[in-house]
Structure formats: structure tokens, C-alpha cells
Amino acid sequence: MKYYRNQDSYWWADADDPFLWRESLPFVRVGLAELIIMTLVSLVLAVIAGWFWWPLAVPFVLVAALVAWFFRNPRRKVPETIGTVVSPADGKLVEIVEVDDPIIGAAVRFGIFLSVFNVHANRIAMPGRVVRVRYRPGKFLNALRSESTKENENIDVELECPEIGGRIVRIRQITGQFARRIVCWARVGDVLQRGEMFGMIKLGSRTELVIPRDEALEIVAQVGEKVCAGSTVFARYQQG
């Protein structure tokens, strides 16, 4: 429990969090347990293997380095301009489509594919108040397949965003073929800022962002672009 901000029925505010200092580490906090255990095991095996013949230690050292790389949490420069929509995930932007959403209405959906080499922390696209967090059980299809959006296990986080008149923005965390663990600590009533971390998907997967479509919306991102959570600008709502 100590490795998590929220886990099971335990939760505390930042002011009461005895482990808040872990937010300053260069690694994602919710991955510290795996990071410590897997790195230590890999390094111990490297020492043992190296005792017999040093080249045998190389694969274990590489595994330790890969684990540390996977759970890294680089600092991001978050745009402050009102109306700016930033990427909720690192990876490759594989989809920009217009959709009719049952809650948002006329909308634009952005799909981001995360490989095992990307940072897997999820960040808020626009500041707002969380109005719904919904979990759906499902399959574990390859995240590159279009049907994974609806059929795979996922979590929706919906925010009411004052910068666009209180309309809803949705971020969906989707599991993949190998990524079968979603972490989300956003709670209904939380007020989250643009670029603020709210969760993580462990191993390769997919993240989607759905925003309202209107005449004031200018999309600046392009399909195929490599994006960074919290800093890459997807779109802007012109203020006027």
C-alpha cells in the first residue's frame, strides 16, 4: 500500500500523505514496487552469473536498465495558454477522427499507441473537475487494432472543463495484449490541472482523448506524430 497514492480502500490528501516525497523521484511513483523488486533481482542474478563468466551478466544488467527506463518520469513543460489541449500520453498519434459521442456530442477523438519503450504515465489534457470515473472489464486485444477501443478493458476519466464552458473531455486508458494493469487514482470531485499526472498503464497499450468539436477548435497535431504527455499540443480552443 505504501507505494500507491490510492489503493484498495485507502486514500489520503496530499497534505496528509506520508510518502509525498516520492513524487520528486525521477520514476513513476506507482511503479516503485516493480522497479525496486525487478531491478534488485536482475542485479543479483547479474552478480551471480558474472561470477562464473562476466558476459552472462550482460542480459540481467540490460533487464535492470530496461525496467528503470520503463518506469521513468521525466519532467514536462506544460503549456499555460487557456484553451490548449495537450496529449494525455506518450507514444505515436495513430488516429484523429470526428465522432458523435453519446455524452459529449459532436467530438474529435485522438488515439495514441504506447510501445513498451514509451513513458507510460497518463496526464490531464485540459484542467477540470472529475465528474465520472468508469471501469469496464474486457478483452486484451492488440492495442493497434481498432476494435481494442471498445472491446479491451479500460477506464474512462471524464472532466468538466471551465476553459470550454464546462463541457466534458474524456480520457480513456486502454489495456493492450501485454499491458493488463491500469492504474488510475483520479476520483470524482478532484480538480486536476493541465499536465497533471492521474494514472499509468503498465507496458504497451493505448490511450484515447475525446474533446468537443466546434468552430473555435483548431487541431494542430498530425497522425503519425510522436507525442509527449503534458507537453505536446493537440488542439486549441480559440478564446473570444
Curated annotation (Swiss-Prot):
- One annotated GO biological process: phosphatidylethanolamine biosynthetic process
Ribosomal protein as a keyword of this entry, yes or no, is no
- Give the annotated active site: S205
Q: What class of enzyme is it?
A: lyase
Q: Which GO terms describe its molecular function?
A: phosphatidylserine decarboxylase activity
The pathway where this protein functions is:
Phospholipid metabolism; phosphatidylethanolamine biosynthesis; phosphatidylethanolamine from CDP-diacylglycerol: step 2/2
Q: Tell me its EC number(s), please.
A: 4.1.1.65
* Annotated keywords: Cell membrane, Decarboxylase, Lipid biosynthesis, Lipid metabolism, Lyase, Membrane, Phospholipid biosynthesis, Phospholipid metabolism, Pyruvate, Zymogen
Q: Tell me the domain of life.
A: Bacteria
Q: How is the cofactor bound?
A: Binds 1 pyruvoyl group covalently per subunit.
UniProt-annotated location(s): Cell membrane
Gene Ontology annotations for the cellular component aspect, listed alphabetically: plasma membrane
Q: Mainly localized where?
A: membrane
List, alphabetically, the InterPro entries matched: PS_Dcarbxylase, PSD-A
Which residues are recorded with the post-translational modification Pyruvic acid (Ser)? S205
User: Which cofactor(s) are needed, names only?
Assistant: pyruvate
UniProt modification remark: Is synthesized initially as an inactive proenzyme. Formation of the active enzyme involves a self-maturation process in which the active site pyruvoyl group is generated from an internal serine residue via an autocatalytic post-translational modification. Two non-identical subunits are generated from the proenzyme in this reaction, and the pyruvate is formed at the N-terminus of the alpha chain, which is derived from the carboxyl end of the proenzyme.
User: What does the record say about its membrane topology?
Assistant: Peripheral membrane protein
Family per UniProt? Belongs to the phosphatidylserine decarboxylase family. PSD-A subfamily.
NCBIfam families xrefs:
PRK05305.1-2 (NF003678)
Q: What does this protein do?
A: Catalyzes the formation of phosphatidylethanolamine (PtdEtn) from phosphatidylserine (PtdSer).
Which protein are we looking at? Phosphatidylserine decarboxylase proenzyme
Source organism per UniProt: Rhodopirellula baltica (strain DSM 10527 / NCIMB 13988 / SH1)
